Amino acid sequence: VSTSSAPARPARPARPALPFEQPRPVEQSQRVRSSPAAQPLDVDVLVVGAGQAGLSAAYHLRRRGFVPLGPDGLPSAGLDDGASPGDRRTFVVLDAAPAPGGAWQFRWPSLTMAQTHAVHDLPGLALDPGDPRESASTAVGRYFGAYEQVNDLRVLRPVSVREVRDDPATGALLVEATTPDGPATWRARTLVNATGTWTKPFWPWYPGRETFAGRQLHTHDFGRAEDFAGRRVVVVGGGASATQFLLQIAPHAASTTWVTRREPVWVGGPFDENRGRDAVALVDERTRAGLAPESVVSVTGLPLTPVYEAGIASGVLRRLPMFSRVVPDGVAWDPGVRPDGVTHQGADVILWATGFRAALDHLGPLGLRGPGGGIVMDGPTVVADPRVQLVGYGPSASTIGANRAGREAVRAVLRVLDGAASRDGAAPYDGARPVVPGPA
């Protein structure tokens, strides 16, 4: 996320709704009733995750005529298109979160819509600009919930996928999950994985980190700035979250210290849709070159808004080089690292705003990772197993990229279902490249 001075975009003109976009009286959170003895529920496409990438994929499945299945494995109530159940291709969307909103619902309450990079429209439904002061977790959660209902996506939640493995007898994928009512299993011909990164916070290792006597927390754990009252806080990370935390914490904390590996790059002007598309293109160019994607801010830079200018002038956003090690009472630099010659900073709290990694542990049994630990991709398709599409990573990690990746993933799904690709017979691709890096 990043602070932006861009004005709110006006709502797009209304357009006629597609047939499947008519509102239906469906539940937003549907329960799966199952038991350890239950037979697998068969489905053509299983979408795991209901953030922007997963919802985009589900939308494009609907456009292609796929029918969403409910928790009982049956098509939507009221569906009457004249086709017999066996003639319809089906999909299911599973989401581990308790409510609509993807990872946005877990963001800290003080993150407002005005402070985020532009949240781009999901396909087929414009986001009402609303109040820029509203919490992003509330606004985006409401938008995603409306999107699920308008498109009758029948998202099943909370469902946590434990494991995806091959079923040699059928050539399908067995997806084992945990629901509030017990275990459940789906047998899917293809899988669109959109589990994101929020559940995999990245904690870099530095010498002595385990010796620190104070509190260590991650962006994932941030709550309120008031929680840091009277504390000496070291914030680690060069992204937008780190700078937002510093500005919020500084009025309450005894002191704040900002450390990064690289000098921050400040960029003037609003972060509009054109800049967003340029950023996606730069990330895509890097992954096409066979390189792991870097952080978002390494591509976009930090927006030099009046709020940030004031933070720089006040000294709150004064960046220091990364410390050399953690000590029980703070952090330490080797002699000569800091320009001012200081070698020690006392701290009560270290806040690691150091990003996230792809949440893909449940795919481990499929053996998708190569010798270096990364997963080689062709667009959203896993080269080692074309039945699996990964969306919401690398170039598709933004709301712009996620929308495009959802569409591309559905095209790839159709190739698999039409027999053009399988685990043992992948369709030709235009040069394999690692998009999802291995575990750190």
Regions found by a protein language model. Give the residues of each.
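Flavin (primarily FAD) cofactor-binding/catalytic cores of flavoenzymes
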Residues: 2-19, 25, 31-97, 102-103, ...
